[in-house]
């Protein structure tokens, strides 16, 4: 039973069909009364009764039609208001700008040689491969990576990951655990592998690698159906793996810390750039000073990101060289002392 049948059928029966049925019976009533012996008084009374009945029926019919029209008008207004609420709710389904900017961005050339495996080479939105100088945005909850422009447009209308549908929205008062960082020291306090979102608990690799593992297990039981010898399950797994950028834990921490430092020091480069422009003699070229400061800040961040992962290896090599030199020096001095004759007193 639809909405019209539920709400309008009783009104139509009581306001339209019943008066029409009574109006249809009037000729039979008048015919039966005309068969009665007539006189002038009774004819006058019968004509008055019929007129009254017709007027009453007309009033009932008009009232029924007016009530149906009013109900339709009010019902249409309610539907319009509900539709506006649905449209507004759909428009508010996206993430806020601050939440979108909290996801780390970087150049593909900076992490191209640090990624684990062969994944993370294609954007799932525009289906184009990453270039070295393109800016990417990385989703820490699911390790999926997209072009910054593509994912920003998507997250402005939707609050889920385009690949694994992980819910990225937060409840009021919540915060992302991987954003717990001491901005003054520049170090991440904690980067857990799991974080709880609204409704579901999504791990860093639960959606992507979990589906891949299930598909690879199902590959054993699914027969080869393609002429090239590749199964459908294997193709699905490989296609999904192309969108997943797996990075070492230290690299993930560096990405998050650099992103937070960039967001927290967004005003500082302007002051530095204005001073640099004034000291360099470019008085009046305030725009050039600001752009120079932003370029200097970006260069410093990229240099810190590029060389931060090589510090440990360089230090270890220097330490090993120093220890080897000290050891050789020690043994060389000892062996040389043994060859020297003892002086007699």
From Swiss-Prot:
Phosphoserine modified-residue sites: 264
Keyword match Transferase: yes
Reactions catalysed according to its record: S-ubiquitinyl-[E2 ubiquitin-conjugating enzyme]-L-cysteine + [acceptor protein]-L-lysine = [E2 ubiquitin-conjugating enzyme]-L-cysteine + N(6)-ubiquitinyl-[acceptor protein]-L-lysine
Compartment annotation: Membrane
Pfam family, one: zf-RING_2
GO-annotated cellular components: membrane
Zinc finger residue ranges, RING-type: 123-165
Domain of life of the organism encoding this protein: Eukaryota
Signal peptide: 1-31
Cross-referenced InterPro entries: RING-H2_zinc_finger, Znf_RING, Znf_RING/FYVE/PHD
TM regions (residue ranges): 50-70
PANTHER family per UniProt: RING FINGER DOMAIN-CONTAINING, RING-H2 FINGER PROTEIN ATL35-RELATED
Recorded domain comment: The RING-type zinc finger domain mediates binding to an E2 ubiquitin-conjugating enzyme.
Name this polypeptide is given: Putative RING-H2 finger protein ATL36
Source organism of this protein record: Arabidopsis thaliana
């Amino acid at each position: 039973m639809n909405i019209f049948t539920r709400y309008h059928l009783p009104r139509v029966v009581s306001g339209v069909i019943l008066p029409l049925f009574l109006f249809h019976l009037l000729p039979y009533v008048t015919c039966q009364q005309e068969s009665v012996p007539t006189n002038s008084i009774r004819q006058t009374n019968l004509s008055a009764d019929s007129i009254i009945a017709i007027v009453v029926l007309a009033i009932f019919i008009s009232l029924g039609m007016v009530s149906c029209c009013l109900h339709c008008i009010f019902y249409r207004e309610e539907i319009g208001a509900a539709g506006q609420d649905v449209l507004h709710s759909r428009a508010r389904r996206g993430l806020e700008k601050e939440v979108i900017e909290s996801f780390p961005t970087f150049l593909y050339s900076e992490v191209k040689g640090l990624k684990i495996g062969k994944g993370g080479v294609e954007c799932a939105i525009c289906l184009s491969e990453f270039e070295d100088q393109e800016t990417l945005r990385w989703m820490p909850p699911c390790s999926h990576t997209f072009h910054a422009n593509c994912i920003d447009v998507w997250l402005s209308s939707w609050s889920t990951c385009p690949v694994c549908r992980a819910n990225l929205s937060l409840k009021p008062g919540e915060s992302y655990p991987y954003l717990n960082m001491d901005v003054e020291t520049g170090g991440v306090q904690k980067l857990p592998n799991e974080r709880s979102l609204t409704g579901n608990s999504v791990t860093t690799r639960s959606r992507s690698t979990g589906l891949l593992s299930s598909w690879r297990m199902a590959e054993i039981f699914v027969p080869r159906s393609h002429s090239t010898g590749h199964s459908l399950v294997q193709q699905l797994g490989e296609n999904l793996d192309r969108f997943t950028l797996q990075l070492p834990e230290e690299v993930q921490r560096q990405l998050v810390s650099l992103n937070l430092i960039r967001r927290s020091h967004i005003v500082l480069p302007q002051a530095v750039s204005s001073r640099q422009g004034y000291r360099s003699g470019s008085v009046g070229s305030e725009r050039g000073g600001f752009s120079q400061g932003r370029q200097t800040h970006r260069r410093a961040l990229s240099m810190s990101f590029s060389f931060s992962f090589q510090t440990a290896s360089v230090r270890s090599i220097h330490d090993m060289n120093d220890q080897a030199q000290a050891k050789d020096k020690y043994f060389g001095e000892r062996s040389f002392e043994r060859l020297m004759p003892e002086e007699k007193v």
